[in-house]
Amino acid sequence: MIDSYCYHPIHNRWQGIRPVSSPGILPTVVEQSGRGERAFDIYSRLLRERIIFLGTGVDDQVADALVAQMLFLEAEDPEKDIQIYINSPGGSVTAGLAIYDTMQQVAPDVVTICYGLAASMGAFLLCGGTKGKRLALPNARIMIHQPLGGAQGQAVDIEIQAKEILFLKETLNGLLAEHTGQPLNKIAEDTDRDHFLSPAKAVEYGLIDRVVDSLTGGGIVKEG
């Protein structure tokens, strides 16, 4: 007998954008030293400054990379902030929760900075940064909504997946309520459909703490 059940991963991703697993363009920088020239890809160079980029959709591969970078930076210096720049349409809920849990567990404060778009799981991770250190650039856009997914096959299999997606929806809504200070019923209402916010509105909502109007050298955020 052939099993006709087909599992569809549960996502928290804006469908207006197709996520990619890796950057299409990878600039390099060259440094001079007493030993000569040394070339780095730009992301490796910025990692030395404790800056991590989430500039793609969220999947297991991306989650593994971000978790590994955070653990490495924690081992390097458990007291110095980690900065995560986010421009992401979202993606896998379970992969996103793996990143989120690591953000909560590492010793350093995690500064989250939205540039471009933080949608779905991207917005959830933005909101999950250390309180007081969740930021957005002036023309960024932020969007929250409920998870999406599906299943096909026998009725019992579909029922199992329906229960799982409802569980994840309640989990995400509860965490958003905790981080924003909004009532759970308002989170549930606002995430029922795509809900876009400007940075200023996101501050009012509690998704972020302030809008950045300038950045100093080294990626350190200056009060605006």
UniProtKB/Swiss-Prot annotation:
The lineage of its organism: Bacteria, Bacillati, Cyanobacteriota, Cyanophyceae, Synechococcales. Pfam families: CLP_protease. The keyword Cytoplasm applies. It is found in: Cytoplasm. Its main location: cytoplasm. GO terms for cellular component: cytoplasm; endopeptidase Clp complex. Fourteen ClpP subunits assemble into 2 heptameric rings which stack back to back to give a disk-like structure with a central cavity, resembling the structure of eukaryotic proteasomes. Cleaves peptides in various proteins in a process that requires ATP hydrolysis. Has a chymotrypsin-like activity. Plays a major role in the degradation of misfolded proteins. This is ATP-dependent Clp protease proteolytic subunit 1. Keywords: Cytoplasm, Hydrolase, Protease, Serine protease. The active site is at S120 (nucleophile), H145. It catalyses: Hydrolysis of proteins to small peptides in the presence of ATP and magnesium. alpha-casein is the usual test substrate. In the absence of ATP, only oligopeptides shorter than five residues are hydrolyzed (such as succinyl-Leu-Tyr-|-NHMec, and Leu-Tyr-Leu-|-Tyr-Trp, in which cleavage of the -Tyr-|-Leu- and -Tyr-|-Trp bonds also occurs). Its EC number is 3.4.21.92. Belongs to the peptidase S14 family. InterPro entries: ClpP, ClpP/crotonase-like_dom_sf, ClpP/TepA, ClpP_His_AS. GO terms for biological process: protein quality control for misfolded or incompletely synthesized proteins. Gene3D superfamilies: 2-enoyl-CoA Hydratase, Chain A, domain 1. One of its GO terms (molecular function) is ATPase binding. It is an enzyme of class 3 (hydrolase). It comes from the Bacteria.
